[in-house]
Amino acid sequence: YPADFNFVCPTELEDLANLYGKFQAVGCEIYSVSCDTHYVHKAWHDASERIQKIQYPMLADPTHCLAKEFEVYIEADGVAERGSFIVNPEGKIVAYEVNAGNVGRNADELLRKVQACQFVAEHGDEVCPAKWQPGAETLKPSLDLVGQL
């Protein structure tokens, strides 16, 4: 996320905090990362009731190494873009989303994407259509489906 003490970030991080148990229930860990220092994270935590709800790790990237590695660093501003990355157990990025700095992300949708990524990892011959939810029908790609959807 771009930075501590701004406007959209606390709403996103609180949204994740509210669903943290659901992410853990599906075997997913959350890490929030900004280019701030851990001292700034601590000050923000102490000052904000929203941030005090957070139980997941808040990582500091003051050298911008992680932001650069994920290709979300904005050199001119010294901050990261607003990005979410789903990394599978093998360490491969299987889904990502990068939003404009003034548009917040949705934790419910991120959880749905995590579950969809887990489903297709377990069922390699099936895909999850738009708005797929756990338990809903999936698709099995085949020549028979071409032009039928």
What are these model-predicted stretches?
Residues Y1-L149:
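Chalcogenol-based redox active-site neighborhoods
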